[in-house]
Amino acid sequence: MSIKISAIALFMLSFTVFVNGIPFFLTKGRIDTCKTLTGETIKIGESWHDPNSCSVYYCEVNSLGAMLIGKTCATVFYPSNCREEPGTGLYPDCCNKVVCGEEEMVVYPYEERSLRRYYFSKF
């Protein structure tokens, strides 16, 4: 009898440890909000601009729950006769601009967040 009770107690302890090991966003908090890097709470569909980097985050939901999806400036390779100038403001205005001679080009990501391609647009 004592062995059976010990086995049941061990099973219950193992189950409790397993359940508490599930990722935080699946077991705690709300599934309709996201927490930003600075601790603010935003709702699904809302965006948040990171004050410490040139990026924007969107609160989205998928099969795992609510999560932040981020966008930041593109890494740009340009000819030697061009240079980068810093941008100002919030994303995407804070992204560096590429200046080649008298022409200025701004690098924009495609609107579809799943694609990691970028295009150039004359300013």
Swiss-Prot record:
Swiss-Prot/TrEMBL keywords: Disulfide bond, Secreted, Signal, Toxin
Signal peptide limits: 1-21
PTM remark: Contains 4 disulfide bonds.
GO molecular function, one term: toxin activity
GO annotations of cellular component type: extracellular region
Localisation per UniProt entry: Secreted
Pfam families registered for this protein in UniProt: SVWC
Main location: secreted
Tissues and organs where the protein is expressed, per its UniProt entry: Expressed by the venom gland.
InterPro entries the record matches: SVWC_dom
Keyword Amino-acid biosynthesis included in the entry's annotation: no
Protein family (similarity comment): Belongs to the scorpion La1-like peptide family.
The protein, known as: Venom peptide MmKTx1
High-level lineage: Eukaryota, Metazoa, Ecdysozoa, Arthropoda, Chelicerata
